[in-house]
């Protein structure tokens, strides 16, 4: 019934298996990939024909994690998987980025790649495995995909590169880098690092590329026995139309791309496009020689050619800068004084307002992952409203791009944050992109660094980011610093680097062409370093280090530790005690399983009151110490005094006063405040207190007072 084919290799110390022919046989391509005991099903379906009038390639990558893969049942009311999580969105983008450039140009059939994690061994991360599975499924599907690609994760532990470190090894690694590419070229890099040098980062990319070569060989081996017949698709030759259009609008486009202001430039480009449209689609002609879709494709190609020729021939860019110059930067902090921290970062025509907010442990984000539930105390959210590029558009929940850009900025900032025991706050940073002309994610990095320092978050060092570009024709190439939006769209590489003056904290690279050599990447990294240092210098004009005090409106948090066996006493039956503390003092209290207690309030007196209350519950009274207490009950033989939190003790009638006492109520009454000295404990552990050895007015020991008076005489 099944015509199965399987390839197995040893990869990074674990078996990798690629199997097809048994599951999802109606898809164009389907591969079940296993690494260790983590299993991913990859399927590919591509429409037989493109939709009429479609002028783009509708590729969708959906990565989904099923909770049954880890032996779990989903939380929530409906008990089933819902909308994609942030991680699922990020992994979908991670796979989309290296495969999209490898589809034959001009292919516009609706294509969907679905990756389903069906088993997770809690050791091997399924993201890279899903990338490999997607590559294998595409390679055998028959769609015009110029792969295969491979992918690998690279760690850096004890000064050594590690191929595909498992989940338990990652906390020890100074690097989390995922690289993907073909046998000859790197196509995509995504990473977070702890201030590593350019040499170490480049070495990791090269190490990863070599590491995934066996995977590419395995996919080719599978395709040799299982691939479907390639689809009969030939990209249309539009060179004649391109030559005709170039003759009509070349001068207009060259003039347009000499205009440095974005909106004015777009007006000039639109005028050139209208001129070409009038030439090729004259009024009265019902059947032009080519379609509107072909016209749009060719005009876009011409735009790219004009920009690329100008840069390679003259070294001058769209806005008049040379290759290395960063646009003018203006930084401002304290923009919104009632927020906890804020910054306005403007670089050319790209601008971000970033606001930092500090919260308590109650504000941490609870993340329910396949590997377990954990809390995240640092959140960074990136918003890209349509007005930032002078357009109208959809508003609402964040799209994939916004999630991805926010996570890149998160990776850049995260290594510089203080440890939780040094700064016990939950941090949320929100970046509102108010203008955009390229590199808004790196503006978010710079703005977030400034806003956090303005809020008093003790960053180890300021962080800045820069986006690099590449124009390559044959052997000629130009690396561009701080690229514009047009240079991103029309160029061959988008290379974002963020870090401090000590090293790189995040790197993201997307390459659209083959032939990006190690030498080109080295040039780009070194040029990015110079740009990053320059940007840090410009940021320092606004604020060079974190403020020593928190903002006026930020909550204060103090941390104390209590014995774990006392946690139940502080919480009380059904939370009765801790609720009373919160209600009476006004402070927020968070108690962790290890006995760490975080007390938060904007009022210092409330924090002190809560600390004192908790201390009275968990601390043990010391023999010989004097305490203030309240009489809670009287009896013939003495008085019971509440003197240490919830602790009561007996003052025997003989210890009430120096003179003989006939009746307890002659000396004290219930509710009366008294001073007592802890004399000790009886054989049953009961507390023995004394009032007569303490001056009830001063709270000082009587014997000590008399001795002091004698010494004075």
UniProtKB/Swiss-Prot annotation:
Keywords: Cytoplasm, Magnesium, Metal-binding, Nucleotidyltransferase, RNA-binding, Transferase. It is an enzyme of class 2 (transferase). One of its GO terms (cellular component) is cytosol. GO terms for biological process: mRNA catabolic process; RNA processing. GO terms for molecular function: 3'-5'-RNA exonuclease activity; magnesium ion binding; polyribonucleotide nucleotidyltransferase activity; RNA binding. Its EC number is 2.7.7.8. Mg(2+) binds at residues 488, 494. It comes from the Bacteria. The keyword Magnesium applies. CDD domains: KH-I_PNPase (cd02393), RNase_PH_PNPase_1 (cd11363), RNase_PH_PNPase_2 (cd11364), S1_PNPase (cd04472). It is found in: Cytoplasm. It catalyses: RNA(n+1) + phosphate = RNA(n) + a ribonucleoside 5'-diphosphate. The keyword Transferase applies. InterPro entries: ExoRNase_PH_dom1, ExoRNase_PH_dom2, ExoRNase_PH_dom2_sf, KH_dom, KH_dom_type_1, KH_dom_type_1_sf, NA-bd_OB-fold, PNPase. Residues 624-692 form the S1 motif domain. Residues 555-614 form the KH domain. Its cofactor is Mg(2+). Involved in mRNA degradation. Catalyzes the phosphorolysis of single-stranded polyribonucleotides processively in the 3'- to 5'-direction. Belongs to the polyribonucleotide nucleotidyltransferase family. NCBIfam families: polynuc_phos (TIGR03591), PRK11824.1 (NF008805). This is Polyribonucleotide nucleotidyltransferase.
């Amino acid at each position: 019934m099944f015509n199965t084919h399987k390839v197995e290799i040893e990869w990074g110390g674990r078996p990798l298996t690629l199997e097809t022919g048994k599951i999802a046989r109606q898809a164009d391509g389907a591969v079940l990939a296993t690494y260790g005991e983590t299993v991913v099903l990859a399927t590919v379906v591509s429409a037989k024909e493109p939709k009429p009038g479609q002028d783009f390639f509708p590729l969708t990558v959906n990565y989904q994690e099923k909770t049954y893969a880890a032996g779990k049942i989903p939380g929530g009311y409906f008990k089933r998987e819902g909308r994609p999580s942030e991680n699922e969105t990020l992994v979908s983008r991670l796979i989309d980025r290296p495969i999209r450039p490898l589809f034959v140009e001009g292919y516009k059939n609706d294509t969907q790649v679905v990756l389903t994690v069906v088993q997770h061994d809690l050791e091997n991360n399924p993201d890279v495995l899903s990338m490999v599975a997607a590559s294998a499924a595409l390679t055998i599907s028959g769609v015009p995909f110029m792969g295969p690609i491979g992918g690998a994760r690279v760690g850096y532990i004890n000064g050594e590169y590690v191929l595909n470190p498992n989940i338990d090894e990652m906390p020890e690694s100074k690097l989390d880098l995922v690289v993907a590419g073909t046998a000859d070229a790197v196509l995509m890099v995504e990473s977070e690092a702890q201030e590593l040098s350019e040499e170490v980062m480049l070495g990791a990319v090269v190490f990863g590329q070599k590491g995934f070569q066996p995977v590419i060989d395995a996919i080719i081996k599978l395709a040799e026995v299982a691939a479907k017949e390639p689809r009969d698709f030939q990209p249309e030759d539009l060179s004649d139309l391109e030559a005709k259009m170039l003759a009509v609008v070349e001068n207009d486009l060259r003039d347009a791309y000499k205009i440095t202001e974005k909106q004015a430039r777009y007006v000039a480009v639109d005028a050139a496009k209208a001129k070409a449209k009038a030439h090729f689609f004259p009024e009265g002609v019902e059947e032009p020689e080519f379609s509107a879709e072909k016209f749009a494709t060719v005009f876009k190609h011409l735009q790219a050619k004009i920009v690329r020729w100008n840069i390679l021939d003259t070294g001058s860019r769209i806005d008049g800068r040379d290759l290395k110059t960063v646009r003018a930067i203006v930084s401002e902090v304290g923009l919104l004084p009632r927020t906890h921290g804020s910054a306005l970062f403007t670089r050319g025509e790209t601008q971000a307002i970033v606001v930092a907010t500090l919260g308590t442990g109650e504000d941490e984000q609870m993340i329910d992952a396949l590997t377990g539930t954990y809390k995240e105390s640092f959140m960074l959210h990136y918003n890209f409203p349509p007005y930032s590029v002078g357009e109208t558009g959809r508003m609402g929940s964040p799209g994939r791009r916004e999630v991805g850009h926010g996570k890149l900025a998160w990776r850049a900032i995260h290594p510089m944050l203080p440890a939780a025991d040094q700064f016990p706050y939950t941090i949320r940073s929100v970046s509102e992109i108010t203008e955009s002309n390229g590199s808004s994610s790196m503006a978010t990095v710079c703005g977030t660094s400034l806003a956090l320092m303005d809020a008093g978050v003790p960053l180890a060092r300021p962080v800045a980011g820069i986006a690099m570009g590449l124009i390559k024709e044959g052997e000629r190439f130009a690396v561009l610093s701080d690229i514009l939006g047009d240079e991103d769209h029309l160029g061959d590489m988008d290379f974002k680097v963020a870090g401090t003056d000590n090293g790189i904290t995040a790197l993201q690279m997307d390459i659209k062409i083959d032939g990006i050599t190690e030498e080109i990447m080295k040039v780009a990294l070194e040029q990015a370093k110079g740009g990053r240092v320059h940007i840090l210098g410009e940021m320092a004009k606004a604020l060079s280090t974190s403020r020593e005090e928190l903002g006026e409106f930020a909550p204060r948090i103090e941390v104390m530790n209590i014995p774990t066996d006392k946690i139940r006493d502080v919480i009380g039956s059904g939370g009765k005690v801790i609720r009373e503390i919160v209600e009476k003092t006004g402070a927020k209290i968070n108690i962790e399983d290890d006995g760490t207690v975080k007390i938060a309030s904007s009022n210092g007196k409330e924090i002190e009151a809560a600390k004192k209350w908790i201390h009275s519950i968990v601390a043990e009274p010391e023999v010989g110490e004097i305490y203030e207490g309240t009489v809670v009950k009287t009896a013939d033989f003495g008085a019971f005094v509440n003197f240490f939190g919830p602790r009561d003790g007996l003052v025997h009638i003989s210890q009430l006063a120096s003179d003989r006492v006939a009746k307890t109520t002659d000396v004290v009454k219930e509710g009366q405040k008294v001073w007592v000295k802890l004399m000790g404990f009886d054989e049953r552990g009961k507390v023995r207190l004394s009032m007569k050895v303490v001056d009830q007015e001063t709270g000082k020991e009587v014997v000590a007072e008399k001795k002091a008076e004698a010494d004075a005489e």
